[in-house]
Amino acid sequence: MKYFQINTYKFKNNISLFLIIFLISSCSSMDMDSLKFWEDGEVDLEEPKKLENFSSNYAISNNWKISSNNGENILGNFIPSFNANNLFIADSSGVVSSINSLSGQINWEIQSTFLSSGVASGFGVLVVSDVDGNVIAYNQDDGSVLWSSNVKAEVLAPAAIDAKFVIIKTGSGELLALDKNSGELKWSYRSKLPNLTIRGSSSPVIVDGQIFVSFDNGRLGVFELDSGFPIWDGAISYASGPSELESLVDSDSSPVVEGGLVYTANYQGNLNIFDLAQKRSVWTSESSSFFSPIIIKGVLAIIEADSSIKTFS
């Protein structure tokens, strides 16, 4: 009896070659435009969407206008603060004002000393900082001084206000908690500063009994509000340049906390997203920005240091 042995490898190759030739010859006789692998009711994902007409014109009415030519805002830290129906503004020359946001009528206006940071408002108080390191709290109703506390350092960013505390971040990298009613220092934390930093600072953010703050060393820190105990921290980016100038990784923008995530950005670094539950970074994209990320309708946007805009879905 004779046995026949088939070369399996060669047999499979011949079958594959035959199938390829058959398919090519079959396709050449077909109308490729009519060849579809989806039903008529389904959407072809590769087909460009049709352009739709839309109107970009909106009618905006000017209810009221107030001009202020006092002081400068080079660092962009003199921004208005809203609370109830009032708008609070301050400038570097020391003018602090309370304005009715509906009518534009000035409720009260006072002259303070030269200021280094703008207004923060909440829980009945209004807080500013002057060039001598004094943190000053005013009564929101009439502008009367409630207390003044010297923190022995320049404060360049508006404070964060809670029912019990006023949280300050100084230009020297120190995070301070002052009693909201008396201005007494309750606790402090000092971060490690690099040798070279950008003049500017980010404001702390208070969410659910925790403080979120970005530092000049390019790190995000999370602290317990009542005690100042560090809960966790993470690097927004790492210094990697060959010189101190190219290694600047200052984070001069406030973190944004939303949906269990913390969105952060820094200069010559990253747009970085941290997960609150995991206490770690879960997504990064190379970026260089002085501004806080913007999250709106499922879109993440960041304004770059060169004024370009990046968006992510």
Where are the regions a protein language model picked out?
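Structural signature of WD-repeat beta-propellers
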Residues: 91-92, 130-131, 170-171, 215-216, ...
